[in-house]
Design a protein with these regions (language model features):
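A contiguous, basic/glycine-rich beta-loop/short-helix subdomain that forms a polymer-engagement track
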Residues: 1
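Residue-level detector of beta-strand structural context in well-folded domains
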Residues: 8, 17-18, 131, 175
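Short beta-strand-centered aromatic/proline hotspots
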Residues: 15-22, 66
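Short, solvent-exposed secondary-structure boundary/capping segments
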Residues: 23-40
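Extended, highly charged accessory segments
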Residues: 40, 48, 52-71, 75-303
Length: 303
């Protein structure tokens, strides 16, 4: 519940539900049949993909796409034969490279099909030098803008935070923005699907740093990390030594402590939580590098 927001769609049992209201002791939901939903998680968040690994993955995708022969109609043009479409395949050099990496024929063929389908859907295969923006409508008629990017959550999460802030400041509504290892998803109300891509996604690097540093204190990540910092520093003592404190009680006490700590400027727990979010979780230097590349044209933004 602590990591959920009004409007989120979740799966519970065999049904999907949309959150309408979150109060102190209950969550009000309504049925949302047929909607794409996420499963409630029962464990802590895992670390996001490292920028270096994401860069290597994007470079590999780019190199493989350069060696891809895309599917095309057969020369006989017979629409009634199974040979009308030639399968996508890699050139000999790329196929041999994949074989040396341990892939068998079926794996190589499936990888070629995957890249071909991606190129068919978006026109460009996302890589370390090409980010792809895709627009579509969801089941409810709202717009989704999907940024395909390989750089990982440590880069995407602060970028998503900045995008959320810009949407609210410039357009006056709260857009739902989600970051994952393979990109960022924006959900916008009907009528806002044609917002300019560059205006939404591109930031001056100093402005970007300032927005993230200012807004991180209001994020769900900050709340969770503050609780962990408070527990480590013994600000959340156990009422019964040796007994486990339920997580909901830890969160309640941490929220009360956070409200009190905000009245004290430069309170050590606040500073440590901000440092942990901005340095240990987020990779702001990498995000600045990417944003500089987008402005310089060394990284392309395709739509």
């Amino acid at each position: 519940v602590y990591e959920s927001r009004v409007g989120d769609v979740i799966t519970l049992g065999t049904s999907t539900w949309q959150i309408q209201e979150i109060t102190r002791d209950r969550v009000v939901v309504v049925p949302a049949p047929g909607r794409t939903a996420r499963l409630p998680f029962w464990h802590g968040d895992q670390d996001g993909r490292d920028y270096g690994f994401g860069l290597a993955q994007g470079r590999l995708t780019r190199e493989l796409s350069q060696g891809l022969h895309r599917r095309e109609p057969a020369k006989n043009g017979d629409q009634n034969t199974a040979q009308t479409v030639l399968e996508a395949q890699f050139n000999r050099e790329t196929a041999q490279r994949l074989e040396r990496d341990g892939l068998d024929h079926n794996a190589i063929s499936n990888l070629a099909k995957l890249l071909d389908e991606q190129c068919e859907a978006t026109g460009t295969i996302p890589s370390d030098r090409d980010l792809v923006v895709e627009r579509c409508r969801d089941e409810g008629g709202d717009w989704r803008i999907i940024i395909h990017s390989p750089y990982g959550r440590r880069v995407h999460e602060p970028w998503a935070l900045a995008i959320t802030t810009r949407i609210k400041q410039r357009f006056g509504f709260d857009g739902q923005v989600y970051a994952v290892d393979d990109g960022i998803v924006l959900r916008l109300p009907d009528g806002y699907g044609d917002l300019p891509t560059r205006e939404l996604l591109l930031f001056d690097v100093d402005e970007l740093q300032r927005i993230v540093e200012t807004q991180v204190g209001e994020s769900v990540l900050y709340m969770a990390r503050f609780r962990e910092c408070a527990a480590r520093s013994l600000f959340l003592p156990r009422t019964r030594p040796g007994k486990r404190v339920p997580l909901w009680q830890q969160r309640l006490k941490a929220a009360q402590l956070l409200n009190a700590a905000r009245t004290c400027k430069n309170f050590p727990l606040l500073l440590e939580t901000a440092r942990e979010c901005l340095q240990d979780v987020y990779d702001l230097p990498a995000l600045r590098t990417i944003m500089t590349g987008l402005h310089a044209g060394t990284i392309l933004l395709s739509e």
